[in-house]
Amino acid sequence: MSFLTLKDVDLKNKKVLVRVDFNVPVKDGKVTSKVRIEAAIPTIQYILDQGGAVILMSHLGRPTEGEYDSQFSLEPVAEVLSQIIKKPVRFAKDWLNGVDAKAGEIVMCDNVRFNKGEKKSDDELSKKIASLGDVFVMDAFATAHRAQASTYGVAKYVPVACAGLLLANEIKALEKALKAPKKPMAAIVGGSKVSTKLSVLHNLLDKVEILIVGGGIANTFIKAEGFNIGNSLYEEDLVGEAKDILAKAKELGVNIPVPVDVRVAKELSENAVAVVKNVADVADDEMILDIGPKSERNIAELLKSANTILWNGPVGVFEFDNFAEGTKALSLAIAESDAFSVAGGGDTIAAIEKFDIKDKVSYISTAGGAFLEFLEGKKLPAVEILKEKATI
């Protein structure tokens, strides 16, 4: 990797500013998911072990920038972190004018979005943040696609900037899957809209041997193949684009197994009864809500041949058990595979948890937007600035 990581930097007696991703769900002042907090522990612990002081920064939710709002305060997060790491975590509500932190201490700064100029990476704000520490550690991959004061601007002005353990692992796993994959490679791109994943589909066409589409995206492809999809969710204006992708895939020898059978219902509800039909038999008043058993077997068979698997998005409305079979079959096929597998995106992580295959996926990305932008082949500003700093 062409940037410094935490392990390349002397941290003894240094004030270490760490941008973490503690954008966690908080309900009635209580943190309801600790996954992102737990993911940051190795970086925090490493700095403490090396004799540094830890000053943590994160955003939480979408408050009006520049205004304090108690419902978006990171104070409950500081309490949970303290319980997990079994050490005191000092909470700093007002921190821009200086943070007093000694070696071995942990300070949690309040929401970076309470600072005016955070989102546009205001220079004065970035300099102020940079003045708080000797070393800046970027460990929030989920916000790496945003050039903001606490992710990008601070790195420009601090003496030393490096990647945290989580960020470094995240990029290493994604580069292993995308830049030097062990072939054959399969990618699963699911979700409701082609429009949000269009660049991803195009970028992956040049890299994979198998491209599996699911969810509303698959409906658009089924329509592109000339079948009636009834009342199903799809994007009419992108049917032509789907045809182009299918034609390009054929040219490149990429296999896109468009579903041959589906599970349909008359309405989208938890109690709707799933009826299995061939794609040619979908009625006008029916909605495609999952793939069918033949399509499940096709996908499972294809994934057996893969040495690298990239997964982003479900293949059906898996939140409802009657339409979860396709995503369950996909999950189990990935779990049983010996391939190097990388999965990312909120719905994908929810599916991994639902079908209990967390330990069977090689790497699970905690990021949403940044994960997608990486798949699109875009550069991530907060990572690029670390590369620039490493060459200075």
Swiss-Prot record:
Q: Identify the residues that bind substrate.
A: 21-23, 36, 59-62, 113, 146
Q: Which reaction does it catalyse?
A: (2R)-3-phosphoglycerate + ATP = (2R)-3-phospho-glyceroyl phosphate + ADP
Q: List the protein's name.
A: Phosphoglycerate kinase
GO molecular function per UniProt: ADP binding; ATP binding; phosphoglycerate kinase activity
Q: Which GO terms describe its biological process?
A: gluconeogenesis; glycolytic process
User: Which superkingdom does the taxonomy of this entry point to?
Assistant: Bacteria
Which terms are listed as keywords in the entry? ATP-binding, Cytoplasm, Glycolysis, Kinase, Nucleotide-binding, Transferase
Under Enzyme Commission nomenclature, its number is 2.7.2.3
Q: Where does it reside?
A: Cytoplasm
- Pathway recorded for this protein: Carbohydrate degradation; glycolysis; pyruvate from D-glyceraldehyde 3-phosphate: step 2/5
Name the protein family. Answer: Belongs to the phosphoglycerate kinase family.
